[in-house]
Amino acid sequence: MKRSRLRTSGILAVVALVAAVVGFVFTRTGSSGPKALTKADVAKTAQTVVDKAIEKAANAPARSVAVYQAIAPSLVVIRTDEATADAATAAPSFATPTVPNRAEQKVGLGTGVIINADGDILTANHVIVGAKLITVTFADGSATTATIKSQEPKTDIAVLAPDQAPSVIVPAVIGGGVQIGDEAYAVGHPLGLTRSLSAGVISGLDRSIKVENGSTLEGLIQFDAAVNPGNSGGPLLNRNGQVVGIVTGLANPSEQGFFVGIGFAVPISTAGGAAGGPPQ
């Protein structure tokens, strides 16, 4: 019996990965003493553990899926009508040297995110500046007009108050700071393709960008998750689905205004301050 136990101990040392399972077998043996394990027993137990781990991983959602599911109920489509010439030129799409003047544009599309239990919406100021009519559509499909609650042109941040809140309000979860190399996700309505998700990384911090109206936006987050016109005002998210920034524009060497790998967002700490306090 002593040799049997020594052999058992030796096998257990080799298969430490399944020690917990093997230990369970030992505790359930009767008074006749422990049964010696064979190589077949160990191999079968190890395979069972591996199979269960694979099954668990397969059933778990991909991180991008979890990120989207976390933000989707808080996402808002913002439509502006009768935009003025000022609204067109204020959009900081960060082209080089300037973006084309879109004074003739009558309808605009942007993104916003619910930030509190009242249904207030955080977005980019250039999305709504100069608009005569603002309509917001919530995740449940309900739509209502909205009024501007606050604006901060220096940071390109605005807060909208919906005239009628949805029946179920799900405020976004607010995150903290980021560092270069962190995963980054952008969700919005690029080119009218509503509720689109793109993924990338944080590429740089504390960027300063001069926009078309001559002002400078400072302290921006640079990221490479794809964004295009329509993403403005939407959330930049971390790997946990928490809002870490508000998308404000993209850099482009051409006049087309489409994404080439450099996007910018206002940090949520700045956006919260511009909105009158840290979003809850």
Task: Give the positions of each predicted feature.
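Interdomain regulatory linker/hinge segments that flank or connect interaction modules
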Residues: 51-53, 183, 264-280
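A secondary-structure boundary/capping signal
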Residues: 79, 123-124, 198, 267
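Glycine-biased strand-turn-strand hairpin within the trypsin-fold
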Residues: 32-121, 129-132, 142-143, 164-167, ...
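Soluble non-cytosolic domains of exported or imported proteins
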Residues: 58, 62, 106-109, 175-178, ...
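Conserved active-site neighborhood of the chymotrypsin/trypsin-like protease fold
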Residues: 109-111, 116-195
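Residue-level recognition of beta-strand microenvironments
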Residues: 78-81, 115-117, 125, 149-151, ...
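C-terminal recognition in membrane/secretory proteostasis and scaffolding
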Residues: 1-44, 66, 111, 147, ...
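Active-site loop architecture of trypsin-fold serine endopeptidases
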Residues: 8-10, 131-134, 166-169, 187-200, ...
